[in-house]
C-alpha cells in the first residue's frame, strides 16, 4: 500500500522531503519517465539542443527553466532532454543551488514549503528524472505545483507521468489512464506541442489493454 503524501500540509510536506532526501526507497513500476523523449518535438529550441547534448544542468539552463518568460512546456522539454541515468543524477540539486544564488527569497520559500509553482515544477520534474527509481518525493512537489497552477496542461501531464512511474507493479491500467484522463480535462486547448503529447501517449497507450 502506498502512503499518500497529500495528507501533509504544504509546509510540512516540503520539510519532510528535505529530511528524507537521502533515505533509500524501493524501486517501483515501469519506466514512463525514461521512455518518453518528448523533447524531440522541441529541438528547434537552442536550450533543448544544449540540454540534450550536455546532459548536465548548468547555470544558463537553470536560469532558462526558472525564468517566468519560459513556458512550462519548454521548461519541461529542457528537463526531459537532460535525461536520466541508472546511477542517478543531481540536476535538481544544481537547480536549487542556482536558485539560492539568484533568488534567495524564492529558495527560502521553497525550503519552508511555500515555493512557487514554477520552482515546485522544476525541482519536482528534475528530481524525478534524477532518481526515477524513487519518485514519490518528486510526485509530491509536482502535485503542489499542479494545485497552485491547475490551468497549465504541461504541469498536469508531467505530474501524471511521474504518478505512472511510481505506480505499484500490477496497476498497469493506471499508467494508461493517468495521461489520458489528464488530456480529457483540458478540452479547450493545450500549451504543449501536439507532437510532444503524442510521444507520451504512444508509450502510455500500450497499457490500454490492461484496463479491460
Feature map (PLM): residue ranges:
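Sec/Tat signal peptide C-region and signal peptidase I cleavage site
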Residues: 23-29
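Short, well-structured alpha-helical interface segments that form or flank functional binding sites
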Residues: 118-122, 136-140, 150
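Amphipathic alpha-helical repeat scaffolds of TPR domains
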Residues: 31-44, 67-90, 114-130, 153-167, ...
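Structural alpha-beta junctions
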Residues: 147-153
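Alpha-helical repeat scaffolds
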Residues: 55-64, 91-111, 135-147, 170-187
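N-terminal secretory signal peptides that target proteins for export/translocation
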Residues: 1-8
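Bacterial N-terminal signal peptides
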Residues: 9-23
Amino acid at each position: 500500500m502506498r502512503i499518500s503524501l497529500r495528507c501533509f500540509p504544504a509546509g510540512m510536506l516540503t520539510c519532510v522531503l528535505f529530511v528524507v532526501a537521502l533515505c533509500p526507497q524501493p524501486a517501483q513500476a515501469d519506466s514512463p519517465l525514461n521512455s518518453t523523449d518528448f523533447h524531440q518535438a522541441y529541438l528547434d529550441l537552442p536550450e533543448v539542443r544544449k540540454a540534450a547534448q550536455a546532459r548536465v544542468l548548468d547555470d544558463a539552463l537553470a536560469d532558462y527553466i526558472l525564468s517566468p518568460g519560459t513556458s512550462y512546456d519548454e521548461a519541461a522539454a529542457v528537463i526531459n532532454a537532460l535525461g536520466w541515468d541508472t546511477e542517478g543524477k543531481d540536476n535538481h540539486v544544481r537547480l536549487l543551488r542556482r536558485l539560492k544564488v539568484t533568488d534567495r527569497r524564492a529558495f527560502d520559500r521553497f525550503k519552508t514549503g511555500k515555493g512557487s509553482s514554477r520552482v515546485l515544477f522544476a525541482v519536482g520534474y528534475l528530481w524525478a528524472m534524477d532518481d526515477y527509481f524513487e519518485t514519490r518525493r518528486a510526485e509530491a512537489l509536482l502535485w503542489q505545483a499542479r494545485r497552485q497552477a491547475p490551468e497549465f496542461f504541461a504541469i498536469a501531464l508531467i505530474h501524471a507521468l511521474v504518478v505512472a512511474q511510481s505506480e505499484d507493479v500490477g496497476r498497469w491500467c493506471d499508467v494508461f489512464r493517468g495521461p489520458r484522463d489528464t488530456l480529457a480535462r483540458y478540452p479547450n486547448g493545450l500549451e504543449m506541442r501536439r507532437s510532444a503529447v503524442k510521444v507520451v501517449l504512444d508509450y502510455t497507450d500500450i497499457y490500454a489493454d490492461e484496463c479491460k
